C-alpha cells in the first residue's frame, strides 16, 4: 500500500477514539501492527489505514467489529479452517473471497455465514442488491425486491369444505 494513501474521516471524534482504543487493546493482548495504528496528524477524525496480525481467540479484536480503516489478518492452513474462523463470529453483515478459482470462491461464499458475500470484490451495494446481515449484524433485508417484503404483512387463509368437518 502506498504510504501516501489517505482515507476520508470517521463519522465523529468519538468513533475515532473508540477505534483507536480497540487497536490499543488488541495490541496489548498480543496483536501485531503491520502498518498504521494511529491517528493521522491533521484536523478531523482521521485514522491511518491499519493492518493487525497475530490475533488469537482470547484477543478482544477476535470478537469485536472495527468500524474504520482497520483490517485484521489471520493465518489459516486450509479452506475448512478459513470458513470455521469466519463463522466463529457474533457478526455477519458481509464478506469477500478473493481467488483465481471462481468455483472455489462461490463454494466458500456459500459456506460463510453472512448476509452478503462477494467473490473477487469488496463489499458494496446498489439499489438492486439486497442489503442486510445476520447474527448481531442485523435481521432482514433492505433494498431490492427482497427488501420490499420486509414491509409486507403476509396472511395465510386456508379454506376447507364445510362437509369435511362433519
Regions found by a protein language model. Name each.
Residues 39, 46-166:
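Conserved C-terminal structural/oligomerization subdomain of aldehyde/semialdehyde dehydrogenase
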Residues 1-57, 85, 119, 164-166:
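ALDH superfamily catalytic-core signature
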